[in-house]
Amino acid sequence: MTDITMRQLLEAGVHFGHQTRYWNPKMAPYIYGARQKIHIINLEETLPAFRDALKFVKEVASKRGKVLFVGTKFAAREIVKEEATRCGMPYVDYRWLGGMLTNYKTIRQSIKRLKELEERLENEENLVGMTKKEILNLMREKEKLSANLAGIKNMGSLPDVLFVIDVEHERNAVQEANRLGITVLGIVDTNASPDNIDHVIPGNDDAIRAIRLYCKAIADTIIDARSVLELQKDEEAKEEKTKAKTTAKKVVTKKAKVAEKAQAAAEKKSEKPTTEKRPTKEAAETKETSEEPKTKEVQQPIEASKAEAEEGK
């Protein structure tokens, strides 16, 4: 996260407020004093508030949240567009359309129409058979829509945070965000009210250097948070690859073991019919000895019966 110092705030002129006659009494806690009828903002209040806001933006960006940059005043337009595109966030730099958040469904239809016009005007084949007046009307419609909606063309859904330069000038945007419960992070000058601003950053909202400092710090914080996210993704992908490799090796080894066991079993089966058991000499002798007494026992009663028959004669 980018670290903001007191020197940077002083060099950018963040401490210069509006003329004393235009002040808002609700900003009294953030005012240090007055010099030549101009209020001086207390940077000891600005610095911690800005750092807290950057921490909050980092948390939102690390969860893939969207931060909508809003700065339609002339001094902020170019800076808001440049820094928002650098960090890949949506922005509103020309005019805040009523219902841009609260009536987002109709805004989506306008965005769809803008994309259709861009695709149609890119290919010359689509313009065949059209008159010059019809082509000019399409180009004017496209320019009008792109001026208001080019920054939120790829937003996709409602933002998570609204970062506003000059909350007094962009009070319609703040009101819509409050209705929808969207967190508002705003640069509040001495002529504005800090009410309904979730993260108040007291500071100069007119000086170009100050506006650039705010927007650059927010954009750098978002880029840092996204880079950390990408590193974590790469590490997770590497871990998954290593796990997949180890599991694949285990499966291969198991299959090899099963194949070896099957092969061994097949070899045993093939060996059984070829190896017939032949009776050994000892087994044959034991059989003969076991058969001899049986023959003797059978012969004895036969001889006795023969002797009795001879005596009778």
Curated annotation (Swiss-Prot):
GO annotations of cellular component type: cytosolic small ribosomal subunit
Region ranges (Disordered): 234-313
InterPro entries: Ribosomal_uS2, Ribosomal_uS2_bac/mit/plastid, Ribosomal_uS2_CS, Ribosomal_uS2_flav_dom_sf
Basic residues bias locations: 244-256
PANTHER family noted in UniProt: 30S RIBOSOMAL PROTEIN S2 PROKARYOTIC AND ORGANELLAR (PTHR12534), SMALL RIBOSOMAL SUBUNIT PROTEIN US2M (PTHR12534:SF0)
Stated family: Belongs to the universal ribosomal protein uS2 family.
Name of this chain's protein: Small ribosomal subunit protein uS2
Organism: Coxiella burnetii (strain RSA 493 / Nine Mile phase I)
Organism taxonomic ancestry: Bacteria, Pseudomonadati, Pseudomonadota, Gammaproteobacteria, Legionellales
Gene: rpsB
